[in-house]
Amino acid sequence: SCSLVGSEMCIRDSIGGNGFAAILKNGGNKTVLFRADMDALPIKEETGISFESVKTTKQNGMDVPIMHACGHDIHMTSLIGTAEYFSKNKDSWKGTIVFILQPAEEIGFGARQMINAGLFKKIPYPDINLALHVSAQTQSGTVHITPGFAMANVDSVDVTFYGEGGHGAYPHLTKDPIVMSSQFITTVQTIISRNLSPINAGVVTVGSIHGGTKHNIIPNHVDLQITVRSYSDEDRELIISRIKKIAESIAIQNDLPKNLYPIVKLRDEYTPAVFNNPDLAMRAKEILSKELGKDKVFDGPQVMGGEDFGQFGRVEPKIPSLLFWIGAVSQKDYKEFLNNSKKLPSLHSSKFLPDYEKTIDTGISSSIALIEAHLCLLYTSPSPR
């Protein structure tokens, strides 16, 4: 943020912790919010480059290595480069640009904390929100745009099954929470296949099971951790409701007293879906096709990953928003990948190494083009979602 602090911008820092806003005003009546996330990941970098991360942080009282394994360094650099361009070329545009540097995206809290700390009372209210994200599976120099739902709602659910433990040789004298958990794990998969519309998408993944201590002991409880992914609010509510009902029905099937019914807890970690305003997405494709070339701009797929940028568009009144993907794979690596001779490191991999110069150039040029188009009225304001 030093590059922004030293400029003529109005600075708002420490918003919801380490959140940061820089406001660049230049007359006009249009306002664009451009956001980049900042946080790194607790991963030891293994890319072998000369500027490989050697930084550490404290996690649970221990020193752990960190690196930018999700491209947030590219995001920040693209934002700063975009800000420098608009600061130095004020004759070519009118309006207001709000540059947001957001912490804690990886844990899903950063955007919410900034909003709860009054972000939108500290800045001019935007007409549109923009953000970008690197892609570890597409070639540098390209852009991918997904109209409508682009990334998923993310929920974390904890379920504890209780029973009456005892000796493994005498299961008829117990109420076995391991068997109940097994019933639950298979049954919740029918939520997606039988309760959700086949046209829609969702995920219920049981990622953690903890129960029992020894071969011949039936435990008193089993703990499950579940990630739930969905797109619409209606599907999200349906999936969570069915998880609760299935857990309770299994308790009833096993003649458990009500004081031993399973506990289903929805963690306060909800990340809303990223919804790309369709009008904004369509116009962005047109603008970037002119800026980069039609052969560089593609329709992007919906993904079940989460991104808390969606929070910025859900404030009232709602703000049309767009998150677009920029390719980060070098031409050489991408060709080898297409020939099945190379596997590409994914985001969150210790070996993730973007083709940084070309990726940053694309991030900056794309962001400038989209912001200028809105401020200079090259297209009309998109209708609300």
Label each PLM-derived region with a short phrase:
Residues 179-381:
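Metal-dependent amide/peptide-bond hydrolase catalytic core
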Residues 76-82:
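DPxDG-like acidic metal-binding loop motif
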Residues 22-27, 315:
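Active-site beta-strand termini and strand-to-loop segments that position acidic
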Residues 1-6, 11, 379-385:
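Single conserved hydrophobic/aromatic residue that forms the stacking wall/gate
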Residues 61-70, 350-358:
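Short pre-catalytic strand/loop immediately N-terminal to key active-site residues, enriched for Gly-Thr
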Residues 45-56, 148-152, 335-344:
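Short, flexible, mixed-charge acidic loops at enzyme active sites
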Residues 26-62:
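Catalytic-core environment of secreted peptidases
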Residues 21, 41, 55-67, 73-74, ...:
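Histidine/acidic-residue-rich, glycine-tolerant segments that coordinate divalent metal ions
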